[in-house]
Regions:
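Long, internal low-complexity/basic segments
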Residues: 111-129, 137, 292-344
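C-terminal, low-complexity/hydrophilic appendages and adjacent surface loops
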Residues: 186-187, 251-294, 329-344
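Short catalytic/ligand-binding loop motif for oxyanion handling, primarily in non-cytosolic enzymes
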Residues: 60-61, 69-76, 172-175, 179-182, ...
Length: 344
């Protein structure tokens, strides 16, 4: 489909004034707004997609539909908030001294001064309201994803169309004392990845560590197109077809200069630019509350995961976004000869 329209620009609509959180470096805010679904960007994207699926297409097509929610700000009409009364919510897991066993560079790197902290949310009583706003946003977008899928299922393309649902990043909703995406921990890098395809196994759930880099090779493979040797990812078609469990796969996340996390089926290993480390066992510690990096019993695990680290990290350049998230990033830019842009 050689036209653009499946992603409306911006993160709005926005009220005239923020409801709770006021910062010029983040969209973070929450509350009931606007009054109607029709005023939401995602509603317009969904309607565009439905229109495209109702058209006749005489050749294969690719249709991308970009939904904003549950990206901040967590605004949605009242009916979506009503589905999640604050007094009935279960709060995300939070440990007050969670970061006591991580290296100093981890605390410096992960500091996000423009975002709310969980301590602040607890003290002000806003945490249930934040979670309500987040869940309202999820319910809203879930409904309109469903509207697009219903349009597909009612179209002539229902039986020969591959559907992939994914998110570009995760989010901390109070875990690790933050409401942010900026981290090398699980909540930031774990994203939805759902594939519905002809020949796939219905209802199958895989615990394999996969990456968004795998999406393009997967779609090439499923569409019967030639593989591209330049792609770093690997096709997930064997996993979707139930032919492979995906054992031995790894996914990497990077944040800042030369800081990387490796996620396998069981462990997450983080190594920072100064050599400091974190290691978490997701079988026994899904909340990543116990850093095992200094435990000699896990030396072999660290060594195995470290083999997945890149041989080198790309240098920062003047075209790098210079907005400093925190003091650590500002210093990192200066060491690279780049004057950081710092917003107040």
């Amino acid at each position: 489909i050689e036209e653009y329209g499946g992603r409306i620009r911006g993160f709005g609509p926005h009220p005239e004034n923020e409801f709770v959180w006021d910062s010029d470096r983040t969209n973070t805010d929450w509350g009931v707004f606007p009054e109607r679904d029709e005023d939401m960007i995602d509603y317009k994207s969904a309607m565009w997609a439905k229109d495209k699926l109702n058209e006749e297409h005489d050749r294969p097509f690719f249709l991308a539909v970009g939904f904003i929610r549950p990206h901040a700000p967590w605004y949605a009409p009242q009916k979506w908030f009503d589905m999640h009364p604050p007094e009935q919510l279960t709060m995300p897991p939070y440990l007050e001294d969670d970061l006591d066993d991580v290296p100093q560079i981890s605390r410096d790197l992960h500091e996000v001064p423009m975002m709310p902290t969980t301590e602040w949310a607890i003290e002000t009583g806003e945490w249930p309201n934040i979670v309500q706003g987040y869940l309202a946003s999820v319910s809203f977008v879930d409904h309109y994803i469903g509207e697009v899928l219903k349009a597909l299922d009612n179209s002539p393309y229902a039986d020969n169309t591959i559907v992939v649902l994914w998110g570009d990043h995760g989010y901390h909703i109070g875990e690790k004392n933050r409401f942010a995406k900026h981290s090398l921990w699980e909540e930031t890098s774990r994203v939805p990845m759902m594939i519905r395809a002809p020949g796939g196994v219905e209802g199958q759930v895989s615990e394999a560590a996969v990456s968004l880099l795998d999406l393009y090779p997967t779609l090439l493979d499923m569409a019967g197109l030639p593989a591209c040797a330049a792609n770093e990812g690997a096709s997930l078609k064997p996993i979707v077809a139930g032919e492979d469990k995906g054992a031995g796969r790894y996914a990497m996340t990077s944040y800042g200069y030369a800081n990387h996390a490796i996620r396998g089926e069981r462990y997450r290993y983080i190594r920072f630019v100064d050599g400091s480390e974190e290691l978490y066992d997701h079988r026994d510690d899904p909340n990543e509350w116990t850093n095992l990096a200094d435990d000699p019993a896990y030396a072999e695990v660290k060594q195995r995961l470290a083999q997945q680290l890149p041989d080198h990290s790309a240098a920062l350049t003047p075209v790098t976004s210079r907005t400093a998230v925190n003091d650590h990033f500002a210093e990192m830019y200066r060491k690279a000869g780049i004057e950081p842009r710092i917003k107040n």
